[in-house]
UniProtKB/Swiss-Prot annotation:
Gene expressing this chain: panC
Additional facts recorded: The reaction proceeds by a bi uni uni bi ping pong mechanism.
E.C. number: 6.3.2.1
Organism in which the protein naturally occurs: Salinispora tropica (strain ATCC BAA-916 / DSM 44818 / JCM 13857 / NBRC 105044 / CNB-440)
The protein's name: Pantothenate synthetase
Residues that bind ATP: 28-35, 146-149, 175, 183-186
CDD domains, A to Z: PanC
Broadest EC class assigned to this enzyme: ligase
Oligomeric and partner information: Homodimer.
Key words of the record: ATP-binding, Cytoplasm, Ligase, Nucleotide-binding, Pantothenate biosynthesis
Length: 282
């Protein structure tokens, strides 16, 4: 039986009633198969699963889609029930931010100003602030985050480590459609032509992976990804395409790396990333 709570007090009471380990999955709702994968991972690795559903206004810029962001709570609850979640915490904005905005924010550091942070100023301040708040409220043993939002995952791990938050952060691989498109709640905004164009993003990343598997160096991997993107259908406005190390530091010459991309397809912003293994240089 899944318990739905809307207030911090009711969440505290529900959390106190859980015995054994607790895993939390933080979402903004509009759940899809990618979220279901997170829920399954949490269910496998914890005795109890707490899901948070909260469209966080702090991580939306003035020209972004906060008001139109989908909020199908009944559908989300059914997914949580099927997944065996013990508690769903779905607060209203004033419940988490009674004064409208917090007076103390989490500063993500330099990495929070790069990539997504450069295109969306203040975004990761809002993300880390709400994540820390929800970690304090849910008191989990483990928290599960998708690798699709790889920069977010990396920053959450840094925050937990630097601030000594007693929780294990578990990254869960990206879930994709059969044609390779990374699952995202924002995919529902895409027109049929836009969805076809969006495949260029995952196609470019896979071209980079293939180039690396063939022995290409970092520059050639990026060139292969750019070439695949340029050869794709029109309608994709690239924001960034970068190759870094797994901690999002400047790209390595050899070994494990991360290839990340972001683009606009019409009015919809999409992000994606893949792991890349660069061949040793002799």
């Amino acid at each position: 039986m899944t318990e739905l709570v809307h207030t911090r007090a009711d969440l505290a009471a529900a959390r106190d009633g859980l015995t054994g380990t607790v895993g939390v999955v933080m979402t903004m709702g509009a759940l899809h198969s990618g979220h279901e994968t997170l829920l399954r991972a949490a269910r496998e690795q914890a005795d109890n699963v707490v899901v948070t559903i909260f469209v966080n206004p702090l991580q939306f810029g003035p020209d972004e889609d906060f008001d139109r962001y989908p909020r199908p709570l009944d559908e989300d609850l059914e997914i949580c029930r099927r997944a065996g979640a013990a508690v769903v915490f779905a607060p209203a904005v004033p419940e988490l931010y009674p004064q409208g905005q917090p007076r103390v924010w989490v500063n993500p550091g330099q990495l929070g100003e790069e990539l997504e942070g450069q295109s969306r100023p203040g975004f990761f301040h809002g993300v880390l602030t709400v994540v820390l708040k929800l970690l304090q409220l849910t008191r989990p043993d483990r928290a599960f985050f998708g690798e699709k939002d790889y920069q977010q995952l990396t920053l959450v791990r840094r925050m937990v480590r630097d601030l000594e938050v007693p929780v294990e952060i578990v990254g869960v691989p990206t879930v994709r459609e059969p044609d390779g498109l990374a699952l995202s709640s924002r995919n529902r905004y895409l027109s049929p032509d836009g969805r076809t164009a969006a495949l260029s993003l995952s196609g470019a990343l896979q071209a980079g992976v293939a180039a690396a598997a063939g022995g290409a160096d970092a520059g050639a991997v990026l060139a292969a990804a750019h070439a695949a993107l340029d050869a794709g259908p029109p309608g994709v406005q690239l924001d960034y395409l970068v190759l870094t190390d797994p901690e999002l530091e400047p790209g390595p010459v050899t070994g494990p790396a991360r290839l990340l991309a972001a683009a606009w397809v019409g009015t919809t912003r999409l992000i994606d990333n893949v792991s890349v293994q660069l061949a040793p240089r002799y």
